[in-house]
Amino acid sequence: MYIKRTVEKSILEAAKSFPCIVLYGPRQVGKSTTLDYVFPANFNRVTLDDTEDRELAEKNPKLFLEVNPWPIIIDEIQKVPALLDAIKIKIDEQRKIWLKNNEERKLMYVLIGSNRFELQQGISETLAGRCGIIEMSSFTLREKKAMEAHLFTPKIEVLIQRSQQEKSEYLTRTQIFEEIYKGGMPDICTNVSERNIYYKSYVNT
């Protein structure tokens, strides 16, 4: 069962503004699952966890992008930093074509990564101004409870109104501690894995 994520809205907004999106966050928080839900099946998908794909990307980034044309979702992008330069060239070439033909620009690349610091360095040096960067975390309480996510506001009257509307959804102190103890990793929240075994394995790997 797919649980709707708050970050979906940010992803769709970035898709309208940039030819490239970078979605990063810890392992197993649902990045690939969310993108599979948000983007249609006509997006190619490849992961650099795959040995053959990774070797091709390392040896010949240009050929890799020709074999795997856009629109494409590339997972574990931080494993092949050299691919960012090839993506930059592809984006710049396509931008010229769109400009010449007076065409609306499209989303070309969606890059997924789990190492924030390696990603930020490569992106700031190579893809600055060409991509929207979005961070994704594990489930929030609102996501787990299917509650509407509101933008922050300092207006007291709005906060009071929201408080009144959500009284029926308040948790008891015991429930709050249970939610903190359980955490927000998707495999636990969807009862795929047992908590203690899951976190022990997660930390050890």
Residue ranges of model-derived segments:
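N-terminal pre-Walker A segment at the start of P-loop NTPase domains
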Residues: M1-A15
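Conserved lysine of the Walker
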Residues: K31-S32
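Hydrophobic anchor at the beta1->P-loop junction of P-loop NTPases
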Residues: L23
